[in-house]
């Protein structure tokens, strides 16, 4: 059964980013490949026709390249940090349906995905937390969520999806 996403909702922003990562994976697989985004496209019931139409423009393809480079650089930095802090907390602020933490998992780190409650509800349905992973519903402006992060082995924070919409 597919997960239905309504137009003109906060959850629609999740679809736009998943679509962008899927297109990056298809157009620039040597730079960035997101198997989770490819799989999620099949799990989401949404009218992608408008996004498909825009995908053919040169400007949109450049945007996809920019996303691919940003995601690749971000994953590089997280993996590099984990080399010297293998049991660190990997904290994805405004995670949406992003699986960067999972793609950087070294088998010892702890992964924390933080977002609004309605977003975490979608994430739990489509990307349930795995081993050593926790999806936390919160408002990033209320720092009480810090109490849920075990940073005893260090911590690396990133917010790839937050600043696009702020």
Per-segment meaning from a language model:
Residues 1-91, 95-138, 148-153:
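Rossmann-like AdoMet
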Residues 141:
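Adenine-nucleotide cofactor-binding loop residues
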Residues 144-145:
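Short acidic active-site motifs
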Residues 154-166:
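A short SAM/SAH-binding and catalytic strip from SAM-dependent methyltransferases
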């Amino acid at each position: 059964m597919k997960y239905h996403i309504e137009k003109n909702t906060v959850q629609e922003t999740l679809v736009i980013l998943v679509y962008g990562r899927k297109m990056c994976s298809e157009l620039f697989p040597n730079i960035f490949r997101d198997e989770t985004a490819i799989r999620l496209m099949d799990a989401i019931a949404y009218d992608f026709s408008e996004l498909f139409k825009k995908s053919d423009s040169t400007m949109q393809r450049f945007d996809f390249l920019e996303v691919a480079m940003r995601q690749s650089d971000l994953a590089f930095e997280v993996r590099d940090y984990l080399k010297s802090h293998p049991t660190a907390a990997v904290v994805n602020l405004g995670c949406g349906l992003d699986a960067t933490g999972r793609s950087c998992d070294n088998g010892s780190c702890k992964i924390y995905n933080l977002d609004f409650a309605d977003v975490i509800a979608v994430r739990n349905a489509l990307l349930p937390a795995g081993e050593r992973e926790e999806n936390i519903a919160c408002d990033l402006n209320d720092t009480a969520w810090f109490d849920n992060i075990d940073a005893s082995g260090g911590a690396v924070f990133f917010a790839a999806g937050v600043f696009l919409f702020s």
